[in-house]
Amino acid sequence: MQYFDLMKKACDSVGMEFNEDKYQKFMLYKDLLKEWNEKINLTAITEDEEIVKKHFIDCIKAFKADEFKKAKTVIDVGTGAGFPGLPIAIMREDVEVTLLDSLNKRINFLNEVVNKLGLKNVKTIHSRAEDGARKKELRENFDIATSRAVANMCVLSEFCIPYVKVNGNFIALKGPNITEELNDSKNAIGTLGGKLKGITEVEIEGTDLNHNLVIVDKIKSTPKTFPRKAGNVTKKPLK
């Protein structure tokens, strides 16, 4: 129970319940992450305490956005090692979480975690973001699309906003310095049917890190021309 108090403090700060069952799931997730990381590249963060703070608590703090407390369906686009989707699924067993990633090795890891943790509310999809968003069963089908992927907001918006229902939200977990990036992305967000709702700053317990949750409202349907074909989204970001 070495990290229980630290994680509970983070949960308390965003109004989420934390208990021993959730803690044990996170610890098993941590062990599987370290084990698989020796076979495939999942994370550069490998120390137990750092995983707890910079992965788990960072994702738990996403619940500072009330939208995550109310949503019934969430898709994590470009989920990688499962962040923030798996922590959201552990914290809220009543929400349906879809984890989407383009690399099959990562999907195999995620399936193992889901099975070992006994998470009944998670499904995984092996797909590129821009391909998945063109599938009828995924497009404009989620209350929230989220991502902690390392890409600028113009790119992330085109990858994520098409998955969101009208009146839903795109929520990006971003680092500390985002003012210029957001100014550059406002037109792109609008083109895709979104409108910037606000930015929520979060402190990561046990560190001196401050991160930002960028919250976008989906106010109208995304034009059928988006997302563009593979490669164009990153090579020629929307302006």
Curated annotation (Swiss-Prot):
EC number: 2.1.1.-
Main location group: cytoplasm
One Gene Ontology cellular component annotation held by this UniProt entry: cytosol
Residues annotated for S-adenosyl-L-methionine binding in this entry: G78, F83, A129, E130, R148
Cellular compartments annotated: Cytoplasm
HAMAP family reported in the protein's UniProt record: 16SrRNA_methyltr_G
Name of the protein this chain belongs to: Ribosomal RNA small subunit methyltransferase G
Organism taxonomic ancestry: Bacteria, Bacillati, Bacillota, Clostridia, Eubacteriales
